[in-house]
């Protein structure tokens, strides 16, 4: 369910021994601020993070507690369809080799309503209907931690694309570097 508190995160020392954490959980109904603080604190203190897809919708505590870590706020997504991601920073180490565009063969384009000053947009796609650009690949500085995030990745068909896998790998290496 989206109201599950992962037991690991309840331990104040949960992150000890981790070099990086990949967040791909979808726990929007968890609203306990102390619990969320326990999740984000290690990242603020320098633990690198990689955020995939539904992780952007987690921990809706009624404020920006989770979204400051993420670097962007998204209230949800539109219908499922293929979309084209434009490379906004081709010289960035994460986006090298990405090319000028990437077609997500299947997906959910998340709506981006707030980008924090600590975030850098690397890729965006235009939303169907109003053609408004939506951030879908970015980095974020969170305290002493580095975060790489992408809303792309709902379907296995997209996540199996070599260009997607290369981008996620470079994002992980960037966050750890």
Specify the residue positions occupied by each region the protein language model found:
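Residues at alpha-helix caps and immediate loop-helix transition turns in enzyme cores, especially N-
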Residues: 14, 34-35, 62, 134, ...
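A glycine-rich, often tryptophan-bearing local segment used as a flexible ligand/cofactor-contacting loop or short
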Residues: 28-97
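Aromatic-Pro/Gly-enriched surface loop or interdomain linker
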Residues: 1-18, 172-173
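Oxidoreductase and adenylate-handling cofactor-binding alpha/beta cores
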Residues: 65-73, 102-106, 113-119, 163-177
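Solvent-exposed loop/turn segments at secondary-structure junctions
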Residues: 4-8, 26-30, 49, 55-59, ...
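Structural recognition of the beta-strand scaffold that forms the well-ordered cores
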Residues: 1, 19-24, 43, 48-53, ...
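Catalytic beta-strand/loop cores that center a nucleophilic Ser/Cys/Thr
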Residues: 72, 79-146
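Extracellular ligand-binding/catalytic regions of CAZymes and related secreted enzymes
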Residues: 129-134, 141-177
